[in-house]
């Protein structure tokens, strides 16, 4: 270890960092409050170790507009992080699931399926569009939305399914798997 701080700890030498890193690997896209609740570290301790893991290149962070989410470095590219960020939000996850299973749908169709107002669905769709996860195409007087890469969404959902807690979405993806 030449040219480095002799007091610096290697990235995963400390048990607490290994624990945090492993938890993020097992639950990619976890946000700070979820990590705080799951790992039961003091807030300052967790912040410190997350910063150290980022600085050492073990973790990356992604901002989804509401939360800062953490990912193992080099395991998720920016598109995968955007997909996982969406899958971590309940209504975005449900919208993505319907689009994955049913293909292109309008705001009204999604509103009916989700039991939410069209304005709420539209807001979530605009966030998905900003993240470049959906495309929209005008169909007469309505606009249909479609996943940009449904196979990638299905793959990421399938791999990380156990980290999501939404039985409705599980049933929709099970339906898709049955085709």
Give residue ranges: language-model regions:
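Long, low-complexity, charge-rich intrinsically disordered regions
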Residues: 1-13, 19-22, 41, 52, ...
């Amino acid at each position: 270890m030449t040219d480095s701080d002799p007091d610096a700890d290697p990235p995963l030498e400390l048990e607490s960092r290994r624990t945090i890193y492993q938890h993020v690997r097992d639950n990619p896209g976890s946000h700070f409050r979820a990590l705080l609740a799951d790992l039961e570290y003091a807030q300052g301790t967790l912040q410190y170790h997350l910063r150290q893991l980022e600085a050492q290149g073990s973790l990356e962070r992604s901002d989804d507009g509401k939360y800062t989410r953490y990912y193992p470095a080099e395991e998720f590219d920016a598109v995968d992080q955007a997909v996982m960020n969406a899958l971590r939000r309940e209504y975005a996850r449900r919208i993505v699931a319907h689009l994955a299973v049913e293909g292109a749908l309008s705001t009204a169709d999604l509103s009916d399926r989700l039991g939410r107002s069209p304005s709420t669905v539209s807001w979530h769709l605009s966030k998905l569009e900003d993240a470049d996860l959906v495309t929209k195409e005008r169909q007469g007087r309505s606009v249909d939305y479609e996943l940009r890469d449904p196979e990638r969404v299905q793959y990421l959902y399938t791999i990380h399914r156990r980290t999501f807690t939404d039985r409705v979405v599980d049933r929709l993806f099970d339906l898709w798997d049955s085709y």
